[in-house]
Design a protein with these regions (language model features):
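Sequence contexts marking disulfide-bonded cysteines in secreted/extracellular proteins
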Residues: 1, 47-49, 53, 110, ...
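Ubiquitin-like/PB1-type beta-grasp interaction modules and other compact soluble beta-rich domains
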Residues: 29, 37-50, 104, 110-119, ...
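Active-site or metal-binding loop neighborhoods of secreted/extracellular toxin and effector enzymes
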Residues: 141-236
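Mature extracytoplasmic/luminal segments of secretory-pathway proteins
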Residues: 45, 103-106, 219, 232
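Cysteine-nucleophile protease catalytic domains, especially the papain-like/related folds used
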Residues: 2-99
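Extended hydrophobic/Leu-rich segments
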Residues: 1, 6, 10, 14-18, ...
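Intrinsic disorder/low-complexity detector
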Residues: 4-5, 13, 129, 195, ...
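...with weaker cross-activation on analogous glycine-rich loops/strands in unrelated enzymes
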Residues: 77-148, 154-181, 185
Length: 236
C-alpha cells in the first residue's frame, strides 16, 4: 500500500478516519468559518448550495440556486423535488469539464474531488452538506483533548491545541477529521447538526430545524476542488 498521500497526524502517524465517518479523497479543504463569518461578506450572500460547490459571493443579497449556473432552472422548477434538484445540480457541474459526478456516500471521491450530499423537506426547502478535511474549531471550554477526540471519533494525536484543556474560544485543529459542514440561512458555517453533535455522516445527523425536517436523502456528488475557483466570488 502506498501511504504517500494518506493524511497524517501531528506525530507523523497515519491519521485515523473518524469513527462512523466516510472516507476522504485527500482533496478536501480545511474547515473554518472565517470566509463566511462576517455579516458583510458571507452570511447574507451565500447559502448551503454555494458553499457546497465552493462558489462564494462577496456582494449581492441573492443566493445561488441549483440550475442557475447551467441556465437550466425554470420558474416552475420545484427544487425540493429530489429528481429536479439532482438534475439541476448535475447540469451545473457539467458546465465545467470534469466538474463533478454522481457518487456513493461510502466510496471516496477520485483525487482532486470532494464529497457533498443533498437532502430535502418536500415542498419546503433543500439543504446541502460538504465534507471537509482538517477541521479548525473553537473550544467550548468544557472538554479536554482526550474527551474531545473520543467525542469526534479520532485519535488524540490528530488534535493540535494550546493546552490539554483549552479555554473557551481557543482554536483546536483536527487533522483529517472528515467532518461535514453546512450553512443554514444567515447563520455561520458549522460542523454540528441540529442536536449540536459533530456531523460524521449527514445521513445519521439530526436534520430537523423547527418545522423543517430535511428527511429525504437526494444524493451524493463528488465536486472538483477547482470547480468554484477562477471566479470573482470563488472561495480561494
Amino acid at each position: 500500500m502506498n501511504n504517500a498521500n494518506v493524511p497524517r497526524s501531528f506525530d507523523g502517524s497515519l491519521a485515523k478516519m473518524v469513527k462512523g465517518g466516510l472516507p476522504l479523497s485527500g482533496s478536501e479543504e480545511t474547515f473554518t468559518n472565517f470566509v463566511y463569518g462576517g455579516e458583510r461578506w458571507g452570511k447574507r450572500n451565500n447559502n448551503c448550495y454555494g458553499f457546497a460547490i465552493d462558489y462564494f459571493k462577496a456582494s449581492e443579497n441573492r443566493k445561488l440556486q441549483p440550475g442557475e449556473l447551467s441556465k437550466t432552472l425554470t420558474p416552475h422548477d420545484d427544487l425540493t423535488d429530489p429528481k429536479v434538484l439532482k438534475e439541476r445540480t448535475i447540469a451545473d457541474l457539467d458546465t465545467k469539464t470534469n466538474g463533478g459526478y454522481v457518487a456513493s456516500p461510502c466510496i471516496k471521491c477520485k483525487k482532486n474531488y470532494y464529497k457533498v450530499m443533498a437532502f430535502v423537506d418536500k415542498g419546503k426547502d433543500y439543504h446541502w452538506y460538504r465534507q471537509m478535511g482538517d477541521v479548525l474549531i473553537e473550544s467550548d471550554g468544557q472538554k479536554n483533548i482526550n474527551s474531545l477526540a473520543k467525542n469526534i471519533g479520532v485519535d488524540k494525536n490528530q488534535l493540535n491545541s494550546p493546552t490539554n484543556r483549552p479555554a473557551k474560544g481557543e482554536p483546536i485543529l483536527i487533522k483529517a477529521a472528515g467532518l461535514w459542514s453546512h450553512k443554514r440561512g444567515l447563520s455561520e458555517l458549522t460542523v454540528l447538526d441540529a442536536s449540536g453533535k459533530f456531523i460524521k455522516d449527514p445521513r445519521d445527523a439530526n436534520r430537523t430545524y423547527g418545522n423543517i425536517n430535511y428527511s429525504t436523502y437526494v444524493g451524493t456528488f463528488c465536486v472538483n476542488k477547482d470547480f468554484g475557483k477562477g471566479k470573482s466570488f470563488a472561495c480561494n
